Amino acid sequence: MRMLHDLFHDFLEKPGQTYQRIVQIFGPIGSGKSCTAYRFGIEFEKEAKTRKIPLEVVHVSCKVGIDSRYALYQTVLQKVAPEIASRGYSANEMLRQLVNHLRNTPKYLLLTLDDVDYLIRTSKEKKEEGGVVFDLTRLNEMFLGEYQQVVGVIFIARDSSFKKMLDPSEVSTLGNVVIKMPSYESAQLKDILKERVDIAFRAGALEDQIVEFVAELSAGKSYNPGDCRFALDILLTSGLIADAELADYVTIEHVRKATSESFDGISTEDLMALDEHVMLTLIGSAQALSFYKTPYVSIKDVYEYYRMACEGREIQPLSYSKIKEYIKDLHFRGIINHHPQKGISIVGASVEDLSRVLQTIERSRELDKEEE
């Protein structure tokens, strides 16, 4: 976080007299990339406010409903200038409207694109039309020789492999300002987990020795050791299991069960964020694979089991074409594998383990509805 402060601090000293900064943040799953950038944004915006600098920090998760330049710019415009966001602009027009709004207001913008690699991989637009990297790193070309209202753009990704999908000209505009986030050590994980437990669990529901056990478990993983997301996922799943069993507190057995139901590449947090029909599509995939006992099943098979899952829950099923879109989305999220010739398979987990986790999440959602 100190490096981010150093990179952008001159803006606070000379607002309106600095050029746009492009920063890349890379790090493995659970290394704190998103949290660090988000926390920095809050502190930076707060510091600007104390200096009476009109700065707005926008943090966009590209995994949540962002599949194109249009969707991205509409989201940013809705946060910065909602009064003009609903008009029928194209993606290019929206970007220009955003910049003009910032110039005319006037105010400044610091934009963070989290999981930008996901957006680049899933973008529906043709490569020759350009992309977000091309657009956002060349804003200075709109008003040559002038300082920018967009203070900077922070691109967050797991690694630099997404650059292989960019044109050489786009890669060069990204520059060389890169922050690499290492994985956490056991002691660091323990401190983070304790802080989260104090917020998410009621007092006495989870003992310190269990927190320490989960921290050591995550730090000692053979794959991606020090994964904070994995550790938080274990605590979340442990809590869900304890809730489902109507237990008063989380025990080591709940943690062991949670560990047996966890797998690399898919987090319970990611699964819980899926909307109803995407979740049912995943349930249909697991049930089809379980029934046929084959490495792959067809989209047609998944759709049939998706329909049955809907009927069993008295939910109106969506169209076949819509489920195909959801399958593509699940594939890009790394939750399933969709092979054009072979079909659909589950990655990072056994079908049985995934089914158990999905059942736990469904039960948790039911309990939440009952409490409402």
Where are these regions (language model features)?
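Conserved catalytic segments around the Walker B and adjacent sensor/switch elements
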Residues: 24, 47-64
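Pre-Walker A adenine-sensing motif
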Residues: 3-16
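Terminal-proximal interaction/regulatory segments of ATP-powered molecular machines
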Residues: 289, 293-372
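Short alpha-helical segments that sit at the start of domains
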Residues: 264-293
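Mid-core helix/loop region of P-loop NTP-binding domains shared across ATPases and GTPases
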Residues: 17, 54-56, 64-192, 201-218, ...
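Walker A/P-loop nucleotide-binding motif
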Residues: 16-39
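Conserved C-terminal helix/linker of AAA+ ATPases
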Residues: 241-266
